[in-house]
């Protein structure tokens, strides 16, 4: 946006403030100045009046003008098409330096002497207004013959071009910029112009009826005006030209000017275009307008079935007034910018920049200010007749109240700001401020035109803007890192700890897709995801469902490594698996295939994996566990005779098994062992310190004949039920059979580790303990001491 110091002065008096200071202030308050320069009409350019204008006798495109410059008359040859007698013009006299390359001198043009030059605005360094000379009028001030042009404020000015961020639509107007500067300098801001006194006794109700359908988000104000022959004042033309808004239509230029100054979005409709259809020869006098939502859900203006405009977005060009005497309907509108932006983005309708740009960033919601300014300009400068009254559709917009405590506000800012100063600064920006009963809290309501204020951080930013960032004392940043160890972090660290232990145990980590092939899973006996919740659009047919197990992918990786020539293959993976109902679980799986130790001394043939050796390595990762015999269910990967549940803390947390011979053959692998564990059961826990006994630990071995179908886990469970605290551990030591032992029995040696926490056990006490165990085994399992 481009403005000049003289354009701002009517709203806030900046005459006494140096231009360089204004430049710095604009940057300080967030209205970044893109460019800044002073523009002054050259010396020896004065106000003149064309008294006579005749065609040059020897040139079709030249005119010979007699120009009065006050003390004398000058003859000037001019080639402008629009020059005519009676015009007030800018005259460059002899010696005037118009540019670095042009100095005015007496000259003869086609034999006729010319004593100066009648100038256009662009020739004097100002924006281009038309194709001819610049015609002066009283809008720049009282015209006096011979008065230097640079003595008029409009032609000796300071030009600012500022960059307005998208959230500061309130500063897309002269009112907005003036309001900001008034707050920064603690100056009075001139309110909106007084309402124009209507001079037409006919009220708006005789010419226009306005209605609406349903609940609206927009506020609208309508006014009717009788236009006469319009003429655009020079001051308005120059103001618009600075911002590249000057167009061909005089009325549209007046509207653009009112919008630029006030920030109110304004449209004009031909009254004739809004009249209802008539079946008689008599033309109706009363136009009818309906506001309702269109097919895209955007609030629009209709006259009957004809759409006049979409509020804040576009206008039907057929409804735009011509620069001719007629009755015109003026419309000022406001819609909250978020509603406009979301509606246009959703419907993808075509938009006109001159409406949408301002509406989507936030136009001025005080509609009377724009309409009053426009009507005043049309009446005073264009001779228009203003009809009395208005039609208004007003919404009750209520800005949210933001509660801020002064301590937090000072913390945001970085230094203590007195309460009175905070209140004063906010009120200068037109905020409403209420103090709480304890004076430590402020209830703040931003003005409607500040749609960018939502929270206390925004309030702090407003205060810093006006205080000036340079006034905030610089000090070292103090911060203390907060403890960020939460459950998720602890779980993550636990999982990575398990992974590190697995790598120390010789397993390599792998990562696979969470997808697998449904037909292949069913082939190996796994329950797949129910069709109702399965993937609708799988990547490929080989990845058409979510995996219920990690083992198939791990076995595929084992095959790939074997084909690459590796003989020692030990892999693990942590990842998601899914139940039939598509509930996510987290699992940990291991696989070991081929040799455990390479074929080098002292293992010339290498060392093969065994189920117990595999279990021992897994125990080094997840901690000690016991095994409980498990018959394979639907899974076809597990060996029926070497398959067990993994028991930890009395709960089944997974399965360990040797690969079924048929599966081993199908995958073309050596002896392979697999395990899959519910990772959610391996919850992290703090190490619990426990006391230990200082007294000797003794071993006692019991060899019994017992039925071979009794699992050792059942024996262990029953012995623990005895509650003998001196038995610290028990485990199977040896199994023996020969022809002398019944084929339904085995010779089982159980080792007991016995220790007291309070004394050294006597032999009689040890014998008593072992006897209790023997009695239990005999009574519950029919075991006999061998």
UniProtKB/Swiss-Prot annotation:
What's in the GO CC field?
A: phenylalanine-tRNA ligase complex
Q: Which UniProt keywords apply?
A: Aminoacyl-tRNA synthetase, ATP-binding, Cytoplasm, Ligase, Magnesium, Metal-binding, Nucleotide-binding, Protein biosynthesis, RNA-binding, tRNA-binding
Q: Which residues form the tRNA-binding domain?
A: 39-150
The answer on whether this UniProt entry bears the keyword Ion transport reads: no
User: What's the catalysed reaction?
Assistant: tRNA(Phe) + L-phenylalanine + ATP = L-phenylalanyl-tRNA(Phe) + AMP + diphosphate + H(+)
Q: Where is the FDX-ACB domain?
A: 693-786
Q: Which InterPro entries match?
A: aa-tRNA-synth_II/BPL/LPL (IPR045864), DNA-bd_dom_put_sf (IPR009061), Fdx_antiC-bd (IPR005121), Fdx_antiC-bd_sf (IPR036690), NA-bd_OB-fold (IPR012340), Phe-tRNA-ligase_IIc_bsu (IPR045060), Phe-tRNA-ligase_IIc_bsu_bact (IPR004532), PheRS_beta_core (IPR041616)
Which Pfam families does this entry report, sorted A to Z? B5, FDX-ACB, tRNA_bind, tRNA_synthFbeta
Q: Mind telling me which HAMAP family this protein's record contains?
A: Phe_tRNA_synth_beta1
Recorded protein name is Phenylalanine--tRNA ligase beta subunit
Q: What is the lineage of its organism?
A: Bacteria, Pseudomonadati, Campylobacterota, Epsilonproteobacteria, Campylobacterales
């Amino acid at each position: 946006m481009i403005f000049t110091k003289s354009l701002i002065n009517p709203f806030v008096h900046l005459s006494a403030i140096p231009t360089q200071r204004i430049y710095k202030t604009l940057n300080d308050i967030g209205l970044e100045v893109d460019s800044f320069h002073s523009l002054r009409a050259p010396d020896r350019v004065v106000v003149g009046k064309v008294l006579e204008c005749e065609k040059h006798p020897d040139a079709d495109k030249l005119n010979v003008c007699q120009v009065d410059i006050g003390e004398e008359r000058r003859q000037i040859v001019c080639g402008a098409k629009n020059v005519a007698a009676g015009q007030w013009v800018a005259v460059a006299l002899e010696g005037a330096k118009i540019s670095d390359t042009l100095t005015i001198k007496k000259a003869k043009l086609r034999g006729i002497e010319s004593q100066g030059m009648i100038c256009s605005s662009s020739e004097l360094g100002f924006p281009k207004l038309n194709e001819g000379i610049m015609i002066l009028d009283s809008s720049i001030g009282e015209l006096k013959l011979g008065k230097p042009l640079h003595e008029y404020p409009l032609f000796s000015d300071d030009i600012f071009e500022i960059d307005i961020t998208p959230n500061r639509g309130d500063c897309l107007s002269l009112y907005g910029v003036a309001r900001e500067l008034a707050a920064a300098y603690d100056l009075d801001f001139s309110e909106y112009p007084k309402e124009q006194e209507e001079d037409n006794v006919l009220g708006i109700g005789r010419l226009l009826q306005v209605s609406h359908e349903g609940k609206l988000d927009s506020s609208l104000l309508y006014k009717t005006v009788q236009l006469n022959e319009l003429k655009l004042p020079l001051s308005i033309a120059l103001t618009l030209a600075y911002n590249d808004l000057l167009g061909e239509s005089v009325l549209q230029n007046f509207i653009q000017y009112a919008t630029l100054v006030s920030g109110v979005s304004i449209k004009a409709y031909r009254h004739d275009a809004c009249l209802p259809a008539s079946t008689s020869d008599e033309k109706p006098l009363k136009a009818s307008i309906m506001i309702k939502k269109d097919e895209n859900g955007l609030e629009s203006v209709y006259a009957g079935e004809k759409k006049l405009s979409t509020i804040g977005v576009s206008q039907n060009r057929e409804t735009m007034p011509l620069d001719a005497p007629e009755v015109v309907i003026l419309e000022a509108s406001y819609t909250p910018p978020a509603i406009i932006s979301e509606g246009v983005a959703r419907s993808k309708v075509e938009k006109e920049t001159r409406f949408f740009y301002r509406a989507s960033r936030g136009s001025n919601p005080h509609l009377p200010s724009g309409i009053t300014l426009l009507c005043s300009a049309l009446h005073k400068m264009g001779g228009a007749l203003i009809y009395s009254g208005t039609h208004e559709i007003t919404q009750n917009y209520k800005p949210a109240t933001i509660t801020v405590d002064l301590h937090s506000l000072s913390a945001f800012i970085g230094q203590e700001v007195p309460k009175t100063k905070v209140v004063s600064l906010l009120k200068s920006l037109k905020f409403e401020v209420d103090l709480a009963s304890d004076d430590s809290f402020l209830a703040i309501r931003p003005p409607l035109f500040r749609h960018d204020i939502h929270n206390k951080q925004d309030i702090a930013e407003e205060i810093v803007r006006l205080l000036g960032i340079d006034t905030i004392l610089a000090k070292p940043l103090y911060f203390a890192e907060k403890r960020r160890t939460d459950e998720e972090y602890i779980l993550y660290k636990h999982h990575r700890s398990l992974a590190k232990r697995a790598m120390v145990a010789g397993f390599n980590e792998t990562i696979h897709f969470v997808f697998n092939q449904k037909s292949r899973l069913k082939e190996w006996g796994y329950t797949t995801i129910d069709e109702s919740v399965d993937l609708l659009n799988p990547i490929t047919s080989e990845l058409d469902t979510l995996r219920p197990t990690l083992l198939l992918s791990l076995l595929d990786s084992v095959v790939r490594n074997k084909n690459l020539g590796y003989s020692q293959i030990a892999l693990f993976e942590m990842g998601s698996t899914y139940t039939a109902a598509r509930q996510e679980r987290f699992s940990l799986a291991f696989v070991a295939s081929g040799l455990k130790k390479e074929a080098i001394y002292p293992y010339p043939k290498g060392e093969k994996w065994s189920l117990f050796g595999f279990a021992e390595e897994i125990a080094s990762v997840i901690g000690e566990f016991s095994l409980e015999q498990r018959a394979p269910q639907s899974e076809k990967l597990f060996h029926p005779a070497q398959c067990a549940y993994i028991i930890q803390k009395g709960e089944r947390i997974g399965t360990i098994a040797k690969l079924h011979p048929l599966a081993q053959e199908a995958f073309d692998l050596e002896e392979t062992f697999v395990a899959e564990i519910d990772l959610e059961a391996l919850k992290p826990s703090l190490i619990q310190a426990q006391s230990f006994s200082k007294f000797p630990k003794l071993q006692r071995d019991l060899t019994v004949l017992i039925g071979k179908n009794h699992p050792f886990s059942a024996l262990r469970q029953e012995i623990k039920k005895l509650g003998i605290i001196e038995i610290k551990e028990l485990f199977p030591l040896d199994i023996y059979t020969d022809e002398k032992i019944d084929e339904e029995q085995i010779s089982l040696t159980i080792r007991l580790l016995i220790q007291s926490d309070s004394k050294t056990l006597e032999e009689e006490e040890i014998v008593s303990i072992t006897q209790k165990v023997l009695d239990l085994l005999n009574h519950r399992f029919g075991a006999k001491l061998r």
